[in-house]
Swiss-Prot record:
One of its GO terms (cellular component) is cytosol. Substrate binds at residues 37, 59-61, 91-100, 217, 235. It comes from Zygosaccharomyces bailii. InterPro entries: Aldolase_TIM, OMPdecase, OMPdecase_AS, OMPdeCOase_dom, RibuloseP-bd_barrel. This is Orotidine 5'-phosphate decarboxylase.
Length: 265
């Protein structure tokens, strides 16, 4: 587990995208990613504008949106990202052969590689998935892009553990500048081999412990103390009548305090 500051890690990181994100986190004093699973662009943009000051990342599932368009959704989302200084993570969870994911990432309705700073993928199809996604990024944009591998999940009964997780880590080692880290519940090592992977952890809640569909929640301090760099929070920010402004500030403070404690044990 890294006890170095985000600022120090940014200065040495092999990935331009990871370096940009770490420096942004340092400057804004936040390690909060807002996961916004809503079904209209209006609601997405409303929540993003409220939560923007408190977050380093917004995590989207644009295939949920009933009214997605490049001009109506992506353009204003990128404007809000510039206004509030956060990056965009499209939680696509690619899981196919290299050539197919290359097309899924760059083409179709969503053209993800053109606007999402970060996306993610399962390791189940092998290292070709990394190569395909990287080629798509290089062919469609001059902007830096980053990929997270799904090493562990927060849902009850997940099969992503043990040998599967180890295999996913080995796939991540095939590309040092494009693969920036993992979706995981704990530190994934790698520092002794020269990797500085970012760990982003879903299923974080200050109050909730679980939901009816198998999601299991851990506390902010618990996930940061076991190696997470970024906490991913969804319904804890805006569900059940919660005020996103108040909750955004609460989670930002909790995440930052836990990070400072890890850096200064």
């Amino acid at each position: 587990m890294s006890t170095a500051t985000y600022h120090d890690r940014a200065a040495k990181h092999a990935s331009p995208l990871a370096s940009k994100l770490l420096e942004l986190m340092h400057e804004k004093q936040t390690n909060l990613c807002a996961s916004l699973d809503v079904d209209t662009t209006t609601e997405l943009l409303r929540l993003v504008d409220i939560l923007g000051p408190y977050i380093c990342l917004v995590k989207t599932h644009v295939d949920i949106l009933s009214d997605f368009s490049m001009d109506g959704t992506v353009k204003p989302l990128k404007e809000l990202a510039a206004k509030h200084k956060f990056l965009i993570f499209e939680d696509r969870k690619f899981a196919d052969i290299g050539n197919t994911v290359k097309l899924q990432y760059s083409s179709g309705v969503y053209q993800i590689s053109q606007w999402a700073d970060i996306t993610n993928a399962h390791g189940v199809t092998g290292p070709g998935i990394v190569q395909g996604l990287k080629q798509a990024a290089e062919e469609t944009t001059q902007e830096p892009r980053g990929l997270l591998m799904l090493a562990e999940l927060s849902s009850k009964g997940s099969l992503a553990h043990g040998e599967y997780t180890k295999g996913t880590v080995e796939i991540a080692k095939t590309d040092k500048d494009f693969v920036i880290g993992f979706i995981a519940q704990r530190d994934m090592g790698g520092r002794d081999e020269g990797y500085d992977w970012l760990i982003m952890t879903p299923g974080v809640g200050l109050e909730d412990k679980s939901d009816a569909l198998g999601q299991q929640y851990r506390t902010v301090e618990d996930v940061i103390s076991t190696g997470s760099d970024i906490i991913i929070v969804g319904r804890g920010l805006f569900g059940k009548g919660r005020d996103p402004k108040i909750e955004g500030d609460r989670y930002r403070k909790a995440g930052w305090e836990a990070y400072l404690k890890r850096c200064n044990p």
